[in-house]
Amino acid sequence: MTPELNLKSLGAKTPYIFEYNSQLLEAFPNPNPNLDPLITLECKEFTSLCPITSQPDFGVIFIRYIPKDKMVESKSLKLYLFSYRNHGSFHESCINTILLDLVRLLEPKYLEVYGDFASRGGIAIKPFVNYAIKEYQGFKEKRLLNAK
Protein backbone atom coordinates (compact mmCIF):
# COMPACT_ATOMS: atom_id res chain seq x y z
CA MET A 1 0.00 0.00 0.00
CA THR A 2 1.22 3.50 -0.83
CA PRO A 3 0.47 5.29 2.47
CA GLU A 4 0.43 8.92 1.33
CA LEU A 5 -2.08 8.20 -1.46
CA ASN A 6 -3.81 5.22 0.20
CA LEU A 7 -3.42 3.11 -2.97
CA LYS A 8 -3.57 -0.67 -2.60
CA SER A 9 -2.39 -1.94 -6.02
CA LEU A 10 0.54 0.27 -6.99
CA GLY A 11 3.83 -1.20 -5.73
CA ALA A 12 2.20 -4.33 -4.29
CA LYS A 13 2.14 -7.96 -5.43
CA THR A 14 -0.56 -8.24 -8.08
CA PRO A 15 -3.32 -10.83 -7.70
CA TYR A 16 -5.07 -10.97 -11.07
CA ILE A 17 -8.85 -11.26 -10.81
CA PHE A 18 -10.73 -12.42 -13.89
CA GLU A 19 -14.28 -11.80 -12.69
CA TYR A 20 -15.76 -8.31 -13.18
CA ASN A 21 -15.06 -6.21 -10.09
CA SER A 22 -15.52 -2.43 -10.01
CA GLN A 23 -14.00 -2.32 -6.51
CA LEU A 24 -10.56 -2.71 -8.12
CA LEU A 25 -10.68 0.91 -9.34
CA GLU A 26 -8.76 3.48 -7.31
CA ALA A 27 -8.32 7.22 -7.60
CA PHE A 28 -5.87 9.80 -6.33
CA PRO A 29 -6.24 13.57 -5.88
CA ASN A 30 -5.82 15.66 -9.02
CA PRO A 31 -2.65 17.72 -8.41
CA ASN A 32 -3.86 20.47 -10.80
CA PRO A 33 -7.66 20.76 -10.53
CA ASN A 34 -7.57 24.26 -12.04
CA LEU A 35 -6.37 22.86 -15.41
CA ASP A 36 -8.46 20.96 -17.98
CA PRO A 37 -6.19 18.33 -19.53
CA LEU A 38 -7.86 15.78 -21.79
CA ILE A 39 -6.28 12.52 -20.62
CA THR A 40 -6.26 9.48 -22.92
CA LEU A 41 -5.86 5.93 -21.61
CA GLU A 42 -5.62 2.98 -24.01
CA CYS A 43 -6.01 -0.72 -23.17
CA LYS A 44 -4.83 -2.75 -26.16
CA GLU A 45 -5.60 -6.15 -24.62
CA PHE A 46 -9.24 -5.96 -23.48
CA THR A 47 -11.00 -9.32 -23.36
CA SER A 48 -14.49 -10.34 -22.33
CA LEU A 49 -16.78 -13.24 -23.15
CA CYS A 50 -19.75 -13.30 -25.49
CA PRO A 51 -22.77 -13.83 -23.20
CA ILE A 52 -24.37 -16.17 -25.74
CA THR A 53 -21.50 -18.36 -26.99
CA SER A 54 -18.97 -17.84 -24.16
CA GLN A 55 -16.33 -17.26 -26.86
CA PRO A 56 -13.69 -14.62 -26.09
CA ASP A 57 -14.07 -11.16 -27.58
CA PHE A 58 -11.01 -8.97 -28.06
CA GLY A 59 -10.81 -5.22 -28.35
CA VAL A 60 -8.98 -2.00 -27.71
CA ILE A 61 -10.56 0.32 -25.15
CA PHE A 62 -9.94 4.08 -25.29
CA ILE A 63 -10.85 6.17 -22.25
CA ARG A 64 -10.59 9.94 -22.41
CA TYR A 65 -11.46 12.25 -19.56
CA ILE A 66 -11.10 15.73 -18.12
CA PRO A 67 -10.59 15.27 -14.38
CA LYS A 68 -12.16 17.35 -11.68
CA ASP A 69 -10.84 16.53 -8.20
CA LYS A 70 -9.75 12.90 -8.78
CA MET A 71 -7.74 10.94 -11.33
CA VAL A 72 -7.77 7.20 -11.97
CA GLU A 73 -4.73 5.21 -10.84
CA SER A 74 -3.53 3.37 -13.96
CA LYS A 75 -2.60 0.02 -12.39
CA SER A 76 -6.01 -0.22 -10.74
CA LEU A 77 -7.58 0.56 -14.13
CA LYS A 78 -5.54 -2.22 -15.73
CA LEU A 79 -6.66 -4.71 -13.06
CA TYR A 80 -10.27 -3.55 -13.41
CA LEU A 81 -10.22 -3.98 -17.20
CA PHE A 82 -8.56 -7.41 -16.80
CA SER A 83 -11.46 -8.36 -14.50
CA TYR A 84 -13.70 -8.53 -17.59
CA ARG A 85 -11.75 -11.58 -18.85
CA ASN A 86 -14.39 -14.14 -17.78
CA HIS A 87 -17.31 -11.72 -17.74
CA GLY A 88 -20.10 -12.46 -20.22
CA SER A 89 -21.40 -9.21 -21.68
CA PHE A 90 -22.08 -7.59 -25.04
CA HIS A 91 -19.55 -5.01 -26.26
CA GLU A 92 -21.97 -2.12 -25.82
CA SER A 93 -22.76 -3.17 -22.26
CA CYS A 94 -19.07 -3.43 -21.36
CA ILE A 95 -18.44 0.10 -22.63
CA ASN A 96 -21.47 1.52 -20.78
CA THR A 97 -20.46 -0.20 -17.53
CA ILE A 98 -16.87 1.06 -17.78
CA LEU A 99 -18.18 4.61 -18.22
CA LEU A 100 -20.61 4.34 -15.28
CA ASP A 101 -17.98 2.84 -12.96
CA LEU A 102 -15.44 5.55 -13.81
CA VAL A 103 -17.99 8.36 -13.47
CA ARG A 104 -18.97 7.00 -10.02
CA LEU A 105 -15.31 6.85 -8.96
CA LEU A 106 -13.97 10.07 -10.45
CA GLU A 107 -16.93 12.46 -10.81
CA PRO A 108 -15.06 13.99 -13.78
CA LYS A 109 -15.88 17.08 -15.79
CA TYR A 110 -16.00 14.92 -18.93
CA LEU A 111 -15.45 11.22 -19.70
CA GLU A 112 -15.79 9.05 -22.80
CA VAL A 113 -15.22 5.37 -23.53
CA TYR A 114 -14.75 3.95 -27.02
CA GLY A 115 -14.33 0.26 -27.84
CA ASP A 116 -12.74 -1.00 -31.05
CA PHE A 117 -13.62 -4.71 -31.02
CA ALA A 118 -12.23 -7.35 -33.37
CA SER A 119 -14.56 -8.34 -36.19
CA ARG A 120 -16.83 -11.34 -35.86
CA GLY A 121 -18.60 -12.60 -38.93
CA GLY A 122 -17.19 -9.68 -40.88
CA ILE A 123 -18.78 -7.04 -38.63
CA ALA A 124 -16.75 -4.85 -36.30
CA ILE A 125 -18.55 -3.33 -33.33
CA LYS A 126 -17.25 0.05 -32.15
CA PRO A 127 -19.41 1.43 -29.33
CA PHE A 128 -18.90 4.96 -27.98
CA VAL A 129 -20.46 6.55 -24.90
CA ASN A 130 -19.73 9.82 -23.13
CA TYR A 131 -20.68 11.82 -20.04
CA ALA A 132 -20.29 15.46 -19.03
CA ILE A 133 -21.24 17.78 -16.22
CA LYS A 134 -23.51 20.69 -17.14
CA GLU A 135 -20.66 23.07 -18.02
CA TYR A 136 -19.19 20.56 -20.50
CA GLN A 137 -22.40 19.52 -22.31
CA GLY A 138 -21.38 21.43 -25.46
CA PHE A 139 -18.05 19.59 -25.53
CA LYS A 140 -19.88 16.28 -25.00
CA GLU A 141 -22.21 16.94 -27.94
CA LYS A 142 -19.31 17.88 -30.25
CA ARG A 143 -17.37 14.75 -29.25
CA LEU A 144 -20.43 12.58 -29.85
CA LEU A 145 -20.87 14.04 -33.33
CA ASN A 146 -17.19 13.36 -34.08
CA ALA A 147 -16.89 10.00 -32.30
CA LYS A 148 -14.15 7.81 -33.71
Swiss-Prot record:
Gene Ontology biological process terms, A to Z: queuosine biosynthetic process; tRNA modification
Residue positions of the active site: C50, D57
Annotated SUPFAM superfamilies: Tetrahydrobiopterin biosynthesis enzymes-like
Broad class of enzyme this protein falls into: oxidoreductase
Gene Ontology CC terms: cytoplasm
Residue positions binding substrate: V72, E73, S74, H91, E92
GO molecular function: preQ1 synthase activity
Entry keyword annotation includes Cytoplasm: yes
Biochemical pathway: tRNA modification; tRNA-queuosine biosynthesis
EC code: 1.7.1.13
Predominant subcellular localization, coarse grouping: cytoplasm
Keywords, ordered alphabetically: Cytoplasm, NADP, Oxidoreductase, Queuosine biosynthesis
Localization in the cell: Cytoplasm
Reactions catalysed, as given in the entry: 7-aminomethyl-7-carbaguanine + 2 NADP(+) = 7-cyano-7-deazaguanine + 2 NADPH + 3 H(+)
Function, as annotated: Catalyzes the NADPH-dependent reduction of 7-cyano-7-deazaguanine (preQ0) to 7-aminomethyl-7-deazaguanine (preQ1).
Family per similarity comment: Belongs to the GTP cyclohydrolase I family. QueF type 1 subfamily.
NCBIfam families in the record: QueF-II
Protein name: NADPH-dependent 7-cyano-7-deazaguanine reductase
Organism whose genome encodes this protein: Helicobacter pylori (strain P12)
